[in-house]
Amino acid sequence: MQLLKVYIQETVMRLTTELVPLFFLTYVAHILQIHGLGVQVGTYALVMLTISVVATAIRIYAQNELSKMPPNKRGNSSFFWGVWAVQAVILIMLALGTWGLINGANLPYTGIFKLQLLFYVGAILDISWLYNGINKTRIVVRRDALLQMLRFVPLIILVKSPSDLSRFIVLLAVTTIVANLLLWLRLPSVLVPVSVTTSNVKFHIKAMLVFLAASLLPQLSLYLNKAVVFVTQGVEDVAVYYSAELLVKVGVALVLGIAMAMMTKVTQQKQIGNSAGIAKSFYDAIEYSSALSILIAVGVATVGPQAVYWFLGTSFAKTGDILQVLAFVIVVASWRYSLSLQQMAAERGFRNISASVQVGAGVNVVLTVFLVPKFGVLAAAWAALIGELVALILQVILLSRVVDVWQLVRVSWRYIVAGVVALLGILAVIRSVPGPYPKFSALEAVVGIVIYTIVVYFFSTPVVTTTNIVVMLALKRMYNSLIEFTRVVLRIDK
């Protein structure tokens, strides 16, 4: 039950920031249509190429240093102002350089590009790394949730036609700025006034160079695919790729909660010095993530292409082809996250835990640059999948002294079989129904879930055993609550 509680907490936090944009997507896709959405996504991706690398490097550096510092407000304050000064100066210089490039290069959609520069203001004001570093993460989580809520009503009021693209971009940027400003309002409770010397600033700049190099490839892989698709294939292709990617991110967020929850088991085993228990936690993480990720991936790959027609519109039909490739990223990423997060919790002497991420991101970037211009938007999806596969393989190699590859296969093959059977069942339904309508998409999803569940129960896996225990405990509590409610209403003494 404790694992279930942690999973729900972790998943809810992530889905808040993933599901709301998904709801926005269906509205924006119908209002701005495929061209408007493509222009927004493409220009945003190009602007974020520089912002994301710098902001991520600063965030990782600051959080890492703050977590090692003693809980002293004066020390934290001196560190904060020194790092933020570096953040502000670098991002202002990048913003000015980007402004000059936009004006001098005679780019298409110049007006839209200039509006996207407002995100530099949001990045300059983003101090979430301070709260994460001093273990006040809930403040950042609330900020992220509030950010999505701030956008909801204004979106419906202000964005009503394809001509409202500029309003949409300003809305996204301004709400980001407002949400980040709210973090500044809490500074008096965590910092005190201090003086900042130039020596502190110079020290931070030198220390950040390593983190800048470490964040380069992973951040490029997040935005370069959409940027290259936008430049070489056009606005419509980048819109359909972004739509597919957003749907897949929701699937990954659902599974990532399992990996986060399983970290508590690794920590407990480490505290009692149980090496065998730590190794078993790796296998358990893979098993539980497989059980959920394979089901979600099968649904995304089969039901997703049908649902796209009514969820986004017929102009987004190409999104279905991309989903059939990106869906498998859900499974591969869930395995990689499960292994890497358990590795971090175990602290078994692996210093270069980012090696797999760096190599996988590098493969993704290289494939994107060379394949997308020639083979189109589907190549971007394959580049993402291959990059994740390379990262997973390298992660397994790094853990070869701790985990057995064949044991990983043994704990996951039954869910793969269940996924294949569910896939065949869903395809049979798709061929039987008259078309891609919401009621038929719901039917396909239900059929897939039922078939998958039956096959998994047939194998009597550990996930089934755990599920039975949780269900029986839940039913017992419901029964006891009903008895107690009846006793109180009827005034029956115990």
What are the residue ranges of the model-derived segments?
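Short runs within selected transmembrane alpha-helices of multi-pass transporters and secretion channels
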Residues: 17, 21, 44-51, 55-63, ...
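Transmembrane helical elements of multi-pass membrane transporters/channels
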Residues: 5-25, 146-147, 151, 168-183, ...
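Hydrophobic transmembrane helix module of multi-pass membrane transport proteins
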Residues: 85-217, 222-223, 428
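Membrane-proximal transmembrane or re-entrant/amphipathic helices at the cytosolic face
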Residues: 427-494
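Membrane-water interface segments that mark the loop-to-transmembrane alpha-helix transition
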Residues: 6-17, 21, 43-44, 48, ...
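Helix-loop junctions and terminal segments of transmembrane helices
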Residues: 54-71, 244, 248-290, 339-346
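Interfacial/gating helices of multi-pass transporter permease domains
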Residues: 23-51, 165, 203-211, 229-249, ...
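Interfacial segments at transmembrane-helix termini and the short loops linking adjacent helices
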Residues: 101-116, 301-331
